[in-house]
Amino acid sequence: MVTTTLPDFKSHCIQLLDQAARQVLPDEVGVQIELLRPKLADHGDYSSNLAMKLARRLRRNPLELAKALIGALPDSSCVEKADVAGGGFINFFLKKTAKQQFLHAVLQAGDSFGHSRLGAGKTIQIEFVSANPTGPLHVGHGRGAAFGASLANIMTAAGYAVTREFYVNDAGRQMDILTLSTWLRYLDLCGLSFSFPANAYRGQYVADMASEIYQAQGDRYAHRSDATIRQLTEISTSTTIDSEDERLDRLITAAKSILDQDYADLHNFVLTEQLADCRNDLMEFGVEFETWFSEQSLFDSGMVARAVQLLDDKKLLYRQDGALWFRSTDFGDEKDRVVQRENGLYTYFASDIAYHLSKYERGFDYLLNIWGADHHGYIPRVKGAIEALSLDPGRLEIALVQFAVLYRDGKKVSMSTRSGEFVTLRQLRQEVGNDAARFFYVLRKSDQHLDFDLDLAKSQSNDNPVYYVQYAHARICSVLGQWGGAEDILARAETELLTDPAELVLLQKMIDFTDTIEAAAKERAPHLIAFFLRELAGEFHSYYNSTRFLVEDESLKITRLALISAVRQILSKGLTLLGVTAPREM
């Protein structure tokens, strides 16, 4: 068995160039060196624009500087040559033997291949989804879930200690609206007819919860039935109420008064039901969290009051029109924000300040919030509050996720939420499957609009990217199954036999895998993994169509099987990072 330490060719080339720069330009030590993968194979395996960057600063000819740097490069066991291209790019060409021998390192590393120490064990909390527990998750939540879960996997592979957190908005007005909606549906089951508010929650799940309550409790919550309906009807038909939102708030207040302690029971029931449904939906989608953090706990623990007091102590609050305002314009926001209303109730922003204070006090090195793109305007006030609390805003990053738009038969699928006619994540998963949903959701950068083609996601064709990648994995499993040998035999591969251009391309893709994971972690970009997998699958399919594997030459057979076994290993790893299965047969 050949024992091979996993080489890092990119870092090696950077070290060579750094040593050359120290020799040619001793006064320019510590300059940052970056290497990129050239688009054209003729330009080598890695390329650097170092000479052009330094030439501008030093007022020297970039071509001459590049040649001087190449002339000063130390000898290397894995670099064949370096040359100058274009206006001063320095291109590195790896030795064929270095690429060939890399195969052994991949096979020996096994499932850990692709992992790196980029994060150096630093802790990062990734908060994502955090949907109001007021109804089933919809397809917009699904994209945030797929993005966050995939990114958490990628960050873990890149050496970060990741904590996944779901912030449960269980203390706000929306939960009161859902409780009211469920109670009104329940009253209808009790034979108490009432005009249902247009801006209440109207989905079938509301009726289902009402039915469950009625079956378990009978008419227990139909308090003072005739008087109840009269009071609710008066509010519903009043012409003195300025807006439908105010009308809904009056109905909520009436419900709390009528039900008294029973209101809390109903509130807890609908919260428990919706949270359980959300957890199950996400778990079935392959998305799990270490922490489910309750907004209500911030009030119960006094954290909200403490956060507001901290701002007050810094003279950053003032009273106006009976409300308490935060001077957020002092920190770049477009206007000041209310943290406590004139009725004494704290705003959602106040609890959000407390929540972020809690995050900082829990000691994470980095914090990443994944929000829907519609929350873009919320960023300045949150960042401002963090700065106002004398916390480091640089530790918090906010990534925005655009909503996905579904298409069926080439036509846009309509979606709404309050009416109950929306497309749920569960419905999407049932139609296209978890694998297609997870993969399609991360095919684009998170801040770009995503057109989700339902017909394509269900098709078994090479046009379907997830099918294309999974089929490559299954094809390899089929070949290895036909061979039937023990996989430890593959360690005997004679890598010098891998001379076909298609084989060298596959080896190069393997070399790129760790760099791709690191780039996806740095750029918060799971789509880079999806792109990589599509490219690797494409190169394999081309190789498969032009190559025989189970040949009579034993050495050549074992070597080719070792190569595709490594491809299978990387395909499986990449799919796992994205929460997608790697089927052995299709």
Swiss-Prot record:
Entries under Pfam families matching the protein: Arg_tRNA_synt_N, DALR_1, tRNA-synt_1d
Give the EC number(s) listed in the UniProt record.
6.1.1.19
Q: Which Gene Ontology terms cover its molecular function?
A: arginine-tRNA ligase activity; ATP binding
The compartments listed are: Cytoplasm
Listed A to Z, the keywords are: Aminoacyl-tRNA synthetase, ATP-binding, Cytoplasm, Ligase, Nucleotide-binding, Protein biosynthesis
Per the UniProt entry, what is one GO biological process? Answer: arginyl-tRNA aminoacylation
Catalytic activity reads: tRNA(Arg) + L-arginine + ATP = L-arginyl-tRNA(Arg) + AMP + diphosphate
Which cellular component terms (GO) are annotated to the entry?
Answer: cytoplasm
Residue window of motif 'HIGH' region: 131-141
Which domain of life, per UniProt?
Answer: Bacteria
**In which family does this protein belong, per the annotation?**
Belongs to the class-I aminoacyl-tRNA synthetase family.
Q: How does it assemble?
A: Monomer.
* NCBIfam families the record matches: argS
The protein's name in its UniProt record = Arginine--tRNA ligase
